[in-house]
């Protein structure tokens, strides 16, 4: 099993009815497989942080999620609380309506949240399902101008998740100035491998264990 596979996974659990025992399992699996991070809703940051102590697994949470329709001030406040409670990484939803109006406030919003993050990783979700190809390119550049560390495809709560076409456009637009995270609807090992081979730096999925098991089976089959 290639080490890179598990180390680019954000194992994600963001559903509204998540219970503590599910967070327990998420964190235990992340420790077992040494996923790069787990991503949980803000209400579970403190809880998950305690479980992850000493595991080497990073803790990610979301801001302005899932619509992005909160103000810059609110996103900054959410980020401050998340970091105070133990978040290592922030996945923030871009204000898509303001972006479509070509408002410079979108760049300033990203910069403001990144300033709070400091050395912590900021990923900006652009929700590619709601953008055309030119808008995807522009959104990548907005994230670069905003000093984000990653541009991320999707929340997983819109019409669709990541596509290989999205990733191709984002890679071309990025000029290697920003990393790319694919997320939303990544359910199988083949999808995972497609995104991995397309050059993404991180993959978010709520099917991380299933994908790892499938990858192990594929590897075993290849070595027969």
From Swiss-Prot:
One of its GO terms (cellular component) is cytoplasm. Pathway: Carbohydrate degradation; 2-deoxy-D-ribose 1-phosphate degradation; D-glyceraldehyde 3-phosphate and acetaldehyde from 2-deoxy-alpha-D-ribose 1-phosphate: step 2/2. SMART domains: DeoC. Pfam families: DeoC. It comes from the Bacteria. One of its GO terms (molecular function) is deoxyribose-phosphate aldolase activity. Its main location: cytoplasm. Keywords: Cytoplasm, Lyase, Schiff base. The keyword Translocase does not apply. GO terms for biological process: 2-deoxyribose 1-phosphate catabolic process; carbohydrate catabolic process; deoxyribonucleotide catabolic process. Catalyzes a reversible aldol reaction between acetaldehyde and D-glyceraldehyde 3-phosphate to generate 2-deoxy-D-ribose 5-phosphate. This is Deoxyribose-phosphate aldolase.
């Amino acid at each position: 099993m290639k080490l890179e596979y598990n180390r680019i996974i954000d194992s994600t659990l963001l559903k509204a009815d998540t219970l503590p025992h599910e967070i327990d399992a998420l964190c235990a699996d992340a420790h077992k497989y040494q996923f790069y991070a787990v991503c949980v809703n803000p209400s579970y940051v403190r809880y998950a942080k305690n479980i992850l102590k000493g595991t080497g697994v990073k803790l990610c949470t979301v801001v302005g999620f899932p619509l992005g329709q909160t103000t810059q001030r609110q996103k900054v406040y959410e980020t401050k609380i998340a970091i105070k409670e133990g978040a290592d990484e922030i996945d923030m939803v871009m204000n898509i309506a303001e972006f479509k109006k070509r408002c410079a406030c979108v760049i300033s919003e990203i910069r403001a949240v990144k300033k709070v993050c400091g050395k912590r990783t900021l990923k900006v979700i652009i929700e590619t399902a709601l953008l055309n190809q030119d808008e995807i390119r522009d959104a990548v550049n907005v994230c670069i101008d905003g000093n984000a560390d990653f541009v991320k495809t999707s929340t997983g709560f819109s019409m669709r998740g990541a596509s290989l076409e999205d990733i191709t456009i984002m890679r071309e637009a990025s000029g290697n100035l920003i990393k790319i995270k694919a997320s939303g609807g990544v359910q199988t090992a083949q999808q995972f491998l497609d995104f991995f081979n397309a050059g993404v730096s991180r993959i978010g999925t709520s099917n991380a264990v299933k994908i790892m098991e499938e990858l192990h089976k594929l590897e075993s089959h290849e070595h027969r």
